[in-house]
């Protein structure tokens, strides 16, 4: 089956002179760090083996009580603070995740409750590591169709609870965390083209079912299996290098731009070799690609919004800059979007005003399995806190 892509540009929705732009951003990662040296004590591996093959040196691990919803809620609260708005100013909450707290209720609904929102529609979206690009496109469509003015777009994962910690080919790759943005509708002034138009310029999405079981998590209703990540690494690598370059190129072209006109690329943080391959394939310099996977590993749908939040804090984006995000994931799926940055990076300081203790996610009576780290990691966390 040949792979088909869909995409869109500003002005293709029901309100032709409306686009969207990012006005708030934030992220949350657990305090507990699992280094490659720590992993040497869990599985047969080494820091040298992991670093040279992936670029990952450490990853963050959720402790007891930290969940996809709790991290997503904190990231979202910071994004709201940066945007200078309240939870009830938001019309839509979309959470991209493959590790929800529960099958039902959705993580988005739990986050809505934690934020104190009373009016937003809320739902989860599953497109694996491409999830944030998909969620962005959905929120963009919602807003440009005139269904609302603002959306929270969140990517959040606790992959440490979906990893087989005896499988050294996968357990070294993944980490936990969450990132969020506030996306707002923006009217386009007459006569603006891609060279000057603010906000979202294009997006590109694809799905290829030929790789459905090259990267997957069993354990669905009626499956009867443990929900642990399984991956054909070689097959996934080939797909990732091919599709990320193709999707990024398509999104940039759809925006009416060339790679030379893009100021920053923020890729899904899966593997440094994949990122370097994409850099060469689209003839784009590595120094203009934001990389933080050495600190966090692969956080799936959370990787792009975490990287975006850190890129702004690092001074890598200023008003007028064009950036492109690109991702691939299980399914297979892939996605990219191109945006011209317009927000004041100094607004990021507002995130510090959020009191984590004020953001509480409701839990079921007696707790839930989603609240607990795997036993092998709990022992590690216990030693760290002695």
Residues covered by each model-derived region:
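Condensing-enzyme catalytic core mediating Claisen C-C bond formation in acyl metabolism
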Residues: 2-64, 167-242, 246, 341-386
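Short beta-strand segments
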Residues: 23-26, 96, 126, 151-157, ...
């Amino acid at each position: 089956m040949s792979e088909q892509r869909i995409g869109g540009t500003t002005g293709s929705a029901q309100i032709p002179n409306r686009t969207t732009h990012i006005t708030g951003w934030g992220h949350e990662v657990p305090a507990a760090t699992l280094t490659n040296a720590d992993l040497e004590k869990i599985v047969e591996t080494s820091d040298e083996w992991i670093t040279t093959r992936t670029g990952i040196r450490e990853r963050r691990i959720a402790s007891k009580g930290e969940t996809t919803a709790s991290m997503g809620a904190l990231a979202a609260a910071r994004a709201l603070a940066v945007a200078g708005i309240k939870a009830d100013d938001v019309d839509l909450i979309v959470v991209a995740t493959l590790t929800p707290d529960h099958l039902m209720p959705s993580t988005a609904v739990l986050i809505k409750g934690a934020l104190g929102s009373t009016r937003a529609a809320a739902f989860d979206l599953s497109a694996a590591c491409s999830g944030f690009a998909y969620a962005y496109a959905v929120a963009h469509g919602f807003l440009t169709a005139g269904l609302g003015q603002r959306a929270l777009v969140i990517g959040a994962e606790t992959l440490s609870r979906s990893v087989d910690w005896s499988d050294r080919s996968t357990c070294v790759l993944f980490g936990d965390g969450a990132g969020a943005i506030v996306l707002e509708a923006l009217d386009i002034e007459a006569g603006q083209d891609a060279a000057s138009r603010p906000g979202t310029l294009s997006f590109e999405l694809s799905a290829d079912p030929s790789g459905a079981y090259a990267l997957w998590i069993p354990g669905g209703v009626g499956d009867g299996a443990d929900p642990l990540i399984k991956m054909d690494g070689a097959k996934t690598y080939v797909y990732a290098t091919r599709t990320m370059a193709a999707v990024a190129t398509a999104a940039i072209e759809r925006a009416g731009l060339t790679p030379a006109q893009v100021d920053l690329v923020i890729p899904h943080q899966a593997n440094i070799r994949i990122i370097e391959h994409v850099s060469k394939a689209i003839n784009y310099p590595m120094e203009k690609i934001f990389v933080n996977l050495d600190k966090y590993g692969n956080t799936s749908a959370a990787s792009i919004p975490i990287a975006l939040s850190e890129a702004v804090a690092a001074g890598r984006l200023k008003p007028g800059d064009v950036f492109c995000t690109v991702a691939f994931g299980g399914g297979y799926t892939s996605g990219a979007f191109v945006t011209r940055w317009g927000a004041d990076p100094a607004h990021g300081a507002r995130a510090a005003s959020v009191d984590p203790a004020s953001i509480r996610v409701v839990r079921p009576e007696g707790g839930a399995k989603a609240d607990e780290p795997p036993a092998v990691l709990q022992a590690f966390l216990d030693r760290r806190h002695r």
